[in-house]
Amino acid sequence: MKSTFLWTACVTPFNCNGDSIDYSSLQRLLTMQVKAENGVVLLGSTGESLSLTDSEKRTLVEFVCKLKLNTEIIIGVPGVNLYQTLEWLDFCKGMPIHGYLMTTPIYAKPGIMGQTLWFEKLLEKAHVPVMFYNIPSRAGINLHAETVRNLSSHEKFWAIKDSSGTVDTLAQYKKVAPNIEVFCGDDNMISDMAAYGAAGLVSVASNVWPYVAHEYVKKCLNGRNPQADIWQQACEALFIASNPIPTKALLHDIGLIEHQTVRLPLSTEDLPSVEKLRQVNKMILGWKELATL
């Protein structure tokens, strides 16, 4: 896992009416990630995992594993019901995957010990390295620094994806658990978080721009910051509506997925316009410093 610094939080393409997964489009996206040498995260919030049935999630993981992709695969682990989550880990144990992304329990807002005991249960079941996911905007609470400290010596606890939106949280995690890698979870924060010791990026933008994202993150991690304003403008455009609505709209517009469909409660009608997305796509493709890609 040490060599992968960019992980793409993959969208889950659907057919036109949204009642099934479009596996042809999914395979096309995954092939691009392999060529760009990016790792893959399946069934996260960008992948609309909460909108998928258990059967759909299992079928998707089986499909991707059968492709035998030449890249590392991380599977999202929900933070809702403990027993269903443990069953999910039992299923994944039989799959040739490389890691888990475990979300801070959502809605319940557990304290330090609640989080610690929750993750202990999951770490005991995990057969591959685990990345915790700090996403307070969705979970309603931060992954506590004390929770990280409590679990930092566990052999399966490998990394944290931090989507707090501030470098202060990353600094806290690095202070209490210097052995745990911290990945930036917000595309527009990677240049700042790289300067504070981030190990890389878990990206939404790399769904659309896998090669550019790979090169940009590499430069940030090497202490360079090529025209960060261009990257930030592009990333902000991908969040003009709830993720992954804009990303799917742009992927469809440029012909990488057949349909921009999302599942309720998300709706494509909440996207103001695709024009802004077209503008930033043109800007990224004309990015002179990365034009060799």
UniProtKB/Swiss-Prot annotation:
Catalytic activity: L-aspartate 4-semialdehyde + pyruvate = (2S,4S)-4-hydroxy-2,3,4,5-tetrahydrodipicolinate + H2O + H(+)
Main location: cytoplasm
Keywords assigned: Amino-acid biosynthesis, Cytoplasm, Diaminopimelate biosynthesis, Lyase, Lysine biosynthesis, Schiff base
GO molecular function: 4-hydroxy-tetrahydrodipicolinate synthase activity
Protein task: Catalyzes the condensation of (S)-aspartate-beta-semialdehyde [(S)-ASA] and pyruvate to 4-hydroxy-tetrahydrodipicolinate (HTPA).
Residues where pyruvate binds: T46, V202
Native organism: Wolbachia pipientis wMel
Top-rank lineage group of the source organism: Bacteria
CDD domains, per the entry: DHDPS
EC class of the enzyme, as a word: lyase
Quaternary structure and interacting proteins, as annotated: Homotetramer; dimer of dimers.
Entry protein name: 4-hydroxy-tetrahydrodipicolinate synthase
Annotated GO CC locations: cytosol
